[in-house]
Regions:
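Alpha-helical transmembrane segments
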Residues: 15-29, 33-34, 47-52, 56-248, ...
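Membrane-interfacial loop-to-helix junctions in multi-pass inner-membrane proteins
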Residues: 1-7
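Extended accessory regions or peripheral subdomains of proteins
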Residues: 10-11
């Protein structure tokens, strides 16, 4: 609720302020696709601290929102941790950082690579029991804690602006929910409740629930019209594989989860290329 969100902002603001004042963190930002020699912008503390607070709170809640299906949030968290670990290890080596034209970080930042390895190892073990059908669950506490921790790790390695790329699965979960709610309110205001109940941008939100519903075959078809599906059809893209007619609901769930996991791996590869090669 609102009080929980307010508490998250308050605690995150205190933590970020402490990090800014007492740890080797400044207001410089590494901008994706822009070489350091071209732009290495500096934000004053009255802008930097609120932005970092927003990143931590946003990251925590994005992970929590994505954790709507068994194991769905686990692999994207692992790819985010892997990216931070690699950046921390290389950035903590002055010679390597200079050679690869990335920000040179404190030598102590290499310890963050150990924390990243722990997150990845825990994720692998967790997958054994969290894969569908799950025996244990991440829950709000786990998702919020891991999301805020991994988001803070990006701040330590000066890669805050890369979090939306490697963590694109989390970002799209949030965006799909915002788009869905905004579209519903617009149709409700302009066309009335009957139209708003019938026409949605996605069948459901967040996006993984849209895929879950879209890929579950029904002879009667969908009782909600999705603008997103209509747009894809007009572009000549069939969003529903034909073989889905033969899938059980459990198999559909597994396919959706694998679909999102594979995308998170591709986003990790893309982010690595952007960070280390596009300079």
């Amino acid at each position: 609720g609102k009080w929980r969100l307010a508490a998250q902002f308050a605690v995150s603001f205190i933590i970020v302020t402490g990090l800014y004042l007492y740890v080797d963190i400044d207001g410089h930002l590494v901008v994706p696709l822009v070489p350091l020699k071209t732009a290495y912008p500096y934000l004053p503390k009255y802008l930097f601290i609120p932005l970092m607070t927003l990143i931590i709170v946003g990251g925590a809640n994005a992970v929590n929102l994505t954790d709507g299906m068994d194991s769905l949030a686990t692999v994207p968290l692992m790819t985010c941790a892997m990216f931070v670990g690699i950046v921390a290890y290389i950035g903590g080596d002055t010679d390597l950082a200079t050679k690869l034209k990335i920000p040179s970080l404190s030598h102590d930042i290499k310890e963050l690579a150990v924390l990243s390895a722990l997150v990845i190892s825990a994720g692998v073990a967790f997958l054994k029991y969290n894969s569908p059908p799950a025996l244990i669950y991440m829950g709000d506490l786990g998702a919020l804690a891991l999301g805020s921790m991994v988001s803070a790790m990006f701040i330590f390695v000066k890669a805050e602006l890369f979090l939306p790329i490697v963590g694109g699965i989390f970002v799209f979960s949030v965006l799909s929910s915002i788009i869905q709610r905004t579209f519903f309110r617009y149709i409700l205001w302009s066309k009335g409740r009957k139209k708003a109940e019938r026409y949605r941008f996605f069948l459901r939100s967040p996006y993984h629930h849209h895929l879950q519903r879209l890929w579950t075959y029904s002879e009667k078809g969908q009782d909600v019209v999705s603008v997103w599906v209509i747009l894809l059809n007009k572009l000549g893209i069939n969003p529903v594989p034909e073989e889905n007619k033969l899938l059980t609901p459990q198999e559909v769930n597994s396919r959706v989860i694998w679909h999102m996991h594979i995308k998170s791996i591709w986003l990790f590869v893309l982010t690595m290329i952007i960070y280390f090669k596009v300079r």
